[in-house]
Curated annotation (Swiss-Prot):
Keywords: Glycolysis, Isomerase, Manganese, Metal-binding. Pathway: Carbohydrate degradation; glycolysis; pyruvate from D-glyceraldehyde 3-phosphate: step 3/5. Binds 2 manganese ions per subunit. Mn(2+) 2 binds at D9, S59, D435, H436. Pfam families: iPGM_N, Metalloenzyme. Belongs to the BPG-independent phosphoglycerate mutase family. This is 2,3-bisphosphoglycerate-independent phosphoglycerate mutase. Catalyzes the interconversion of 2-phosphoglycerate and 3-phosphoglycerate. It is an enzyme of class 5 (isomerase). Its EC number is 5.4.2.12. Mn(2+) 1 binds at D394, H398, H452.
Amino acid sequence: MEAALVILDGWGLGDGDETDAVAAADTPAFDALAERGATGQLETHGRSVGLPDGQMGNSEVGHLNIGAGRVVKQDSTRVTDDIDAGVFADNEALARAFDHADDHDGRVHFMGLVSDGGVHSYQSHLHALVDLAAERGVEAVTHAFTDGRDTAPKSGVGFIEDLAATVEEAGTGDVATVCGRYYAMDRDENWERTKRAYDAIVHREAPHEADSAVAAVAASYDRGDTDEYVEPTLVSGTDAPLSADDAVVFFNFRADRARQLVRMLADIDPDWAFETDPPAAALVTMTEYDETFDLPVAYPPLAPEQPLGAVLAESDRTQLRMAESEKYAHVTYFLNGGREVAFEGERRDIVDSPDVPTYDEQPAMSAPELTDAAIDHIGADAPDVLVLNYANPDMVGHTGDFEAAKAAIEAVDEQLGRLESAIREAGGHLFVTADHGNADDMGTPEAPHTAHTTNPVPFVYCTPDGTDGGYTVRDGGTLADIAPTLLSTIGVDIPETMTGESLLER
């Protein structure tokens, strides 16, 4: 075994105050690594990862930059640039969707996450679509998915009010349904959740109805449900079930939490345990959600050339990607630059995430089982390079539960200690880092913080003998520097397409 890259998803370096679950946790394994190894910090937000200034990073962007070895201009930025340049209406895939609705006297259905979180969508993109519908004279409706995970738990009503103002000015785009992302954006094959969002959109069947979208969210708060958990709700006066005469524009720019609902709406590989019969609407996705989906894409991927996986394959290295199912896409699709298919010599071992409503109920998640599997691989069929993601700091951090997040950090630390011992015994270099912060700011019980942070993340390097090897970590590093660092450490030439630089210096 040559090297292991361990990604502590959501483990940021905060202020160490009462909101910082990372600092509050007992982390003897990580602390020992940081003491023995070469230790530094990396930036994971804004322009350092191809996002607008000040925009917090996320797991998709983080893994994409880690794998690319260079700063990758994000799809969200491409969309925004077109809107700002006044050429958004010229997009061919979007134009065809509007043409379909216009030619068949149908509607365009906009659906996606309505918030300013910037992780899965921008509300400005939805507002631009509403304005475009008005310009085209096409009737439009919106299926609004509320956030509360990448934004404050009860901020959704404000975003809905902003949308209502745009709709009123445009004269189209009324909200037809409201649904929390817990249902509409599941990514762990909890198909019964997806089906509830599907039924509201396609059949206008939902447990609740409200006079307005704002009232729908307010009623959810009254029931004790925050934005993420808003149950599917129909908005009265907008009788707009989905039909074959209609078009759909799914405006999320991030793929992983959009796939399930798109699969159900387009009847792609229906392996769920109930029958669905969606109408043959013209469906367009803002970005490519899956390269196997035969659907029009408004902004096809600009895949990074020669990501880490490709370079390892070209050098005849074997590699193993490991995570629990919540982070499957990140250690495979995103790390590989938007490629679903494994590279030559790349194996994948994904452990199921626990079947619980929210991960504060099981902060350890599947970290022990994931570590067991990794140690088994290292002992029996060790890859040349292991990439492993621990999901806990991010997934539990999103619940806003400080004590659960603290427990999640401690659970990961325990497993990191076990894994580090196995890697050292196998003679591997160890790199430990994170893709963004989260558990480093949990807010307060009165005002829980469930979103990512813009804090830096750790970067720790240990030689096969568990020391810093005389190296230090330079200042000013970003996620784009990780792949070049790993490659140079194991003696693989860094391709010209990787503009990142090694983080290690003597």
